[in-house]
Structure formats: C-alpha cells, structure tokens
Amino acid sequence: MKLDYWQENFFKVNLILLILIFFLMSCSDQIEQEHDAATFNSLIEEYDFHSSKINIVIKDNIDIKGRPTTAGSLALEGNIAKDNAYLVQKLLDNNFHIAGKANLSEWANFRSYYSVSGWSSLGGQTYNIVGLDFNPCGSSSGSAVAVAVGIVDVAIGTETNGSISCPSSVNGIVGMKPTVGLVSRTGIIPISVSQDTAGPMGKNVTIVARTLEAIAGYDPKDSATAEIPQNFDFNFLENLKQSSLKGKRLGVLQSDLSDRHANDLLNKLQTILEQAGAEVVLLNDQRAYPYEDEYFLLKYEFKTGLEDYLLNATESKKTLEEIIYFNEQNAETVMPFFGQEILLESLETENLIEQYQRAIDATQKTKAETIAFLKSNKLDAFVGLTRGPAWKINYEGGDDKAMDDVPSFSMGGFAAISGLPHLTVPFFQMEQFPIGVSFIGLPWSDKRILELGAALERELTNYDGKDFIAMENTPIKSSFLIIDVRSDAEVLEGQLQDSVHIEWTQIVDSIDTVTSSKDQQIYLYCRSGGRAGRAELILKDLGYQNVENLGSIEQASNILDRKILKLAN
C-alpha cells in the first residue's frame, strides 16, 4: 500500500471521498469506534491500517454492522446496519480487515438516465485517477479508485450491469464479476435478484482470487447460491502461478468497433494472445441485446428487492414511494444535477406481472444463446476490450451526453444479463486512459477465467509496447487546475466543484503532486483572496506563470461556472 501517496492526495485531489467521516473504523475495533476526521492531519494520525491482515474497503451499498448503509443517498443517511452482510462476515472470518466504506454512484447508478457516474448526494463526486475532469465510471467508483490510488490492494464492488468491470477498466485495476450465485447478496441493497452480484476489485489477479475465495459460498438466505455445483472448486489461487494461455481457445467478439484505435488495440491483443500460444477465433456476433426487456426487469425487481431490504432495516422509510418523496422534498441537495425518473418508473411496474414474465423470458433466451455461442465454438472464454476510455464529467447532460465525445465500445452486457463470470485485467491505454482486457466464460467457470487473467497479466512483462499505463503516482492531468488554498476545516464547509485542496502553506511541497507542467493554467481561491494572493506569488516564484487569484470561493464559482459542493459531515 502507498500510504504516503494517500496522505499527499486524500483531501488535495478529493479523489474519492473514500472513507466518509462517519464510516471510519479503528484497527483495534473495526466495528465499534468512530474517529473525528475534522481535519486531514487528525484523520491520518488517528487512522491506521491493520499490519497483519488484508485491508479492504467495502462499497456503501453493503451492510457493516453498526455503520450506515446508504447507497450514496441522503435518504438512507440514518440506515444503520443491524448485522454484517454475509460476505462481510466471511471477510472478517478470513483474515481481512474492513478499513472503511467507498463512495459509489447513487443508488448504484439506478436513479436517472442522465446520472453522473461516481456522484452521490451523500458522498459527492468521485474522480478518475488519471484526471480530475474525467469520470471514474460506476457504480463501484470509490472501490476502483481506492485500489488505483494505492489506499488498499483490494476492494469489494457490486455489479448489476457493468458496475465492476467499467470502473475497474477505466481506472486501470483488475475487477471480477463472479457467476451470479457464487457470492451471497444477503445484506446488500439490491437492484435485481436476477443480475446482482458482489465481486472483488484489486491491484492484481492474485489478490482478487484470494478475496473471491473468502467471500464465495452457500448462504441459506440467498437462494441463488444453492445453484453452486456440488463439485465446484473454490481453490481459485491453486493454479494461478502455473496458468498459461497456451492451447486455450479464445473467441474475439467482432462487434461494432468503428473506432480505429479500438481496432488497432484488438489486433494487438490477438497477436499477443497468439504469441502466448492461444488459439484465437474471430467471431461474428449476431446476438440481439434485449435492452427494453432487461431494463423493465431491473425496474420491476428493484422496487420489490428494495422494499424487502428496507422491511428489516433500521431506516424509517420502508417503501420506494417514501424514498421518492424524500428526494422531492430535498431536491436542492439530492437532485442538483439529475432527477429520479428511473425510481418513478420502477414505482409504476408494481402490477405489470405479465410484462415482467415476458422480460424474464427474453433475458433467459439471451442467456441461453450466449451459453450456446460459447459451447458451439468450443471456447474457453470470450476475450476482448472491456470498454472505451473515461469520459469527461458532465453535470449538464450526464454520462449519456458525455460518452458521445469518446470512443464507445463494451463487451460486458451479455455477461451481466446472463449471469456469467467476467474478469477485466488492465493492459492497454487509449488517449492516456487505461483500457482493460476482458475474459468472459460459462457459468461456474470462475476459476478458469481467473487463470486466464493471471496468464495475461504475466504477458505484460513480455510486452514491449507502450499501450499500458501504470496508475501509481500518475500526475493529475486537466486542461486547467483549480486549487482551494483554505484550511482543512474550511474545506469541510464546502468546496468548489472540480477543485483540489492544497493549504497555501503547503503549496511549495505539494504542487507537483497535482500537476507535472509549469505551463498549466492554475486558478486559486480562498475565503477572501488574501491567501490565494500569497499562493499566487509563491507559484510564480517557482516558475508557474499561468497563475490567477480568483478571490473568494463565491467569486471563483461565478467566474468558472462551478458549483460549490458541500462535503459529507
């Protein structure tokens, strides 16, 4: 772990709002004791990682006894978990230390069609590790960035469709979506009983496999786990070091990759796999994706699943309707950027049982076609590029609009809808952003998929191309930089959207952690302009010529057209 890197960047770049103030746990008593994180220094001094256990952070839609489980929503701010989620207890029983909770896209990105991934009304905006202008994807945003920045080696995310694979890929880490049913969902705020799963996200395949060993298994409270085959091999670590791509038959999906750079990377991947001894089969994918049926299924199951969860929760709101009402009454803080049309549509599905059955039939048909596609081509796995590069954060039109400006491709949808294991391993880069390589296999082939990922990971040592970006200590890139030079305590009262925090007295020691160019445009602000003026003179003495003092936070907000975001407290 790179604790020194975390200390340098935790508040300064506001990357993840990773461990929210009221989630902090001490190592000696990881469930009972809270810490006062009023200032950055007191947080670092008081908070220690366990020296002899595997430190891990948990996405904040998963129960930890005595801690809030919020799904990033202010509506659930007081939802204190009665018990540990099944997977959390298994982690504690297997020498893991729960270091804290990670921010996520609110309601696991299931609130609005125009949502901004990585943003939640409770936790604020999580940023991509490479650039503050860019989105970390979601919904397991904080889990991905926590690993990418080096705070922990592994985290737990959840996925309904893309919520592990996407943030893992765009932040340059390994992410594993297991076969649905391999990991219990008990104690997790749900979207869909058909597609939900939790899974590990880590710095390499080995730690991901180790974590999956710990959390996998039968849970009598989750009927999906009863589908685990009786002879299933849970020893995911067993053959990782000896695994090889030699002789493996891998199918490259020739889907619509209209982007030249994506095709170039796919061709490079084919060459690398073949040089490693794999047999690569180019597949003409004619499957039709049932978008409307899948989304209806998710909306129908969300209402039922959420209300089942709330029934036994400490949260006083027990229905989706009450959640919606709370959001409406607190729209200024809950919905400053986008609405809740998905929640409203979910509410309307309640009695549409026949349409729900049609949706089940359609998605099951797609699953059968996908499994048949793998089997008929005698494949060990599908392989391909996980998804396109990160897109810019856009609060005006959300991800939907922002993704129009970047190459858009992905291969995780069929795995999600079919409940198949999906592993992404960081390998390439595009436009300075990571691109993962995905392996997708048959149900319960999780061990084989991990072995393929470990074998590909080793190919990095033999690969002399420059298409892989190492995430650790990567300078933050942006067209311009906004620096808040106030004190730590002042920042807790609110911070300008997209700004980083460096107290003016620390500017000399810390400026090179947020920019690698003395030509970059830098804007400074504070409470009234005085400290920003002193910081401006210091930076110009250091050779930074494009520096401007914007005065107070309110003046900076008006000049730069940036909102003032209040941090969780």
Residue ranges: model-predicted function:
Residues 39-46, 177-264, 460-467:
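A short helix-breaking turn/cap at a secondary-structure junction
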Residues 25-26:
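C-terminal motif of bacterial Sec signal peptides marking the signal peptidase cleavage site
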Residues 56, 62-68, 76-77, 90, ...:
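Gly/Ser-rich, acidic/histidine-flanked active-site/gating loops
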Residues 2-15:
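Bacterial N-terminal signal peptides that target proteins for export
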Residues 29-161, 179, 267, 271, ...:
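Gly/Ser-rich catalytic/binding loops embedded in alpha/beta enzyme cores
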